[in-house]
């Protein structure tokens, strides 16, 4: 498994322990969907200003968000073999993750882990565009986080 990490913010430090949890989440998401670990994921940590700009540029939404996912695989994901294939890019605003961890009353690490898990399922072709799809995605996210004992503390 290749994780390409680009920390483009200077507001919050990211521990090695959190990086290891992120790797575990990525591997578990793929395993849960029946794929092996012959893949690459690009992960960028940014601040609110940068994610706001990216959200406006790529989604046409003029506000800060917590995470953006840029899948590189086609919609026919089931037909794609992951042989050293790049799944795509995940961009997380650590600044927003900290704000949300306070808002939801759990740890910063738990919030970042949730955002990575959420984004991984986007890279794997899932979306939350309907109530049914949202429910399916939430169940998958909770399964992965519970399996790795990443709780709301």
UniProtKB/Swiss-Prot annotation:
**Which is a GO BP term held by this UniProt record?**
rRNA processing
Cofactor field:
Zn(2+)
Q: Where does Zn(2+) bind?
A: 118, 122, 128
Q: Which GO terms describe its molecular function?
A: metalloendopeptidase activity; RNA endonuclease activity; zinc ion binding
EC class name = hydrolase
For this UniProt record, the keywords arranged alphabetically read as follows: Cytoplasm, Endonuclease, Hydrolase, Metal-binding, Nuclease, Ribosome biogenesis, rRNA processing, Zinc
Protein localization: Cytoplasm
**Primary location class:** cytoplasm
Q: Name one GO cellular component term.
A: cytoplasm
One Pfam family per UniProt: YbeY
Q: Which Gene3D superfamilies did the record assign?
A: Metalloproteases ('zincins'), catalytic domain
Q: Which InterPro entries match?
A: MetalPrtase_cat_dom_sf_prd, YbeY
Question: Could you confirm whether the keyword Hydrolase appears in this record?
Answer: yes
| Cofactor detail note | Binds 1 zinc ion.
Q: What is its EC number?
A: 3.1.-.-
Q: What role does this protein play?
A: Single strand-specific metallo-endoribonuclease involved in late-stage 70S ribosome quality control and in maturation of the 3' terminus of the 16S rRNA.
PANTHER family given in the database record: ENDORIBONUCLEASE YBEY, CHLOROPLASTIC
Entry similarity comment: Belongs to the endoribonuclease YbeY family.
The name on file for this protein is Endoribonuclease YbeY
- Species in which this protein is naturally found: Clostridioides difficile (strain 630)
Whichever gene encodes this chain, its name is ybeY
